[in-house]
């Protein structure tokens, strides 16, 4: 939509729009800024899983922390751990875990998958890697299964894709290793 000519975009009155939800993966910062400039402060960032729990960022909070997928919903909790389950400090990427006291789930017919994605404290993970900032806003790096390790360094394809997508001559990109 952003590639539409300005005269086409200006033909449409979007002033009545109150809310638009962006979900599934973090929106590239440049794309989100341009959409907010066009549509106004109506685009909310949303991150969640069917299993329960999630985050949300209203437009003003996203502008304060570009790239965030938000803070935990009321009554939900987030934590970031290393591969051994130890909590990581603010700003340190690790496995994202969520907890929603009012929700529970299991993978139908797959107790071992259910068990490996839950911890003793009732948190679950879908395998995303991210970090929390000092104000509790979650930033996603990538899915752990997509991470590339080269020379002992963790490389997140989504970060590279975001940088490449910022170039005006690029319409879409996929990075894999």
What is the role of each PLM region?
Residues 33, 67, 112, 162:
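Active-site phosphate/pyrophosphate- and oxyanion-stabilizing loops and adjacent acidic/basic residues
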Residues 16, 75, 169-172:
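Glycine-centered tight turns that cap/initiate beta-strands
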Residues 48, 87, 98-100, 105-106, ...:
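AMP-binding/adenylate-forming catalytic core of the ANL superfamily
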Residues 81-82, 118, 126, 132:
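Hydrophobic alpha-helical segments, especially N-terminal targeting/anchoring helices
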Residues 62-69, 116:
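Short, P/G- and charge-enriched loop/turn segments at secondary-structure junctions
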Residues 71-75, 86-117, 153-155:
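Conserved ATP/PPi-binding loop(s) of AMP-dependent carboxylate-activating enzymes
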């Amino acid at each position: 939509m952003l590639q539409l000519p300005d005269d086409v975009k200006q033909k449409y009155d979007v002033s009545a729009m109150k809310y638009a939800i962006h979900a599934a993966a973090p929106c590239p910062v440049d794309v989100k800024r341009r959409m907010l400039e066009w549509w106004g402060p109506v685009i909310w960032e949303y991150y969640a899983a069917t299993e329960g729990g999630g985050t949300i960022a209203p437009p003003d909070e996203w502008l304060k922390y570009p790239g965030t997928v938000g803070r935990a919903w009321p009554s939900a909790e987030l934590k970031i751990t290393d591969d051994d389950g130890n909590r990581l400090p603010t700003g340190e990427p690790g496995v994202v875990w969520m907890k929603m006291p009012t929700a529970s789930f299991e993978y139908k017919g797959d107790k071992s998958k259910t068990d490996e994605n839950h911890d003793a404290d009732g948190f679950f993970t879908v395998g995303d890697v991210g970090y929390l900032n000092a104000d509790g806003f979650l930033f996603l790096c990538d899915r752990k299964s997509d991470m590339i390790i080269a020379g002992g360094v963790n490389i997140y394809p989504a970060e590279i894709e975001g940088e490449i997508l910022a170039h005006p001559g690029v319409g879409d990109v996929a990075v894999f290793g």
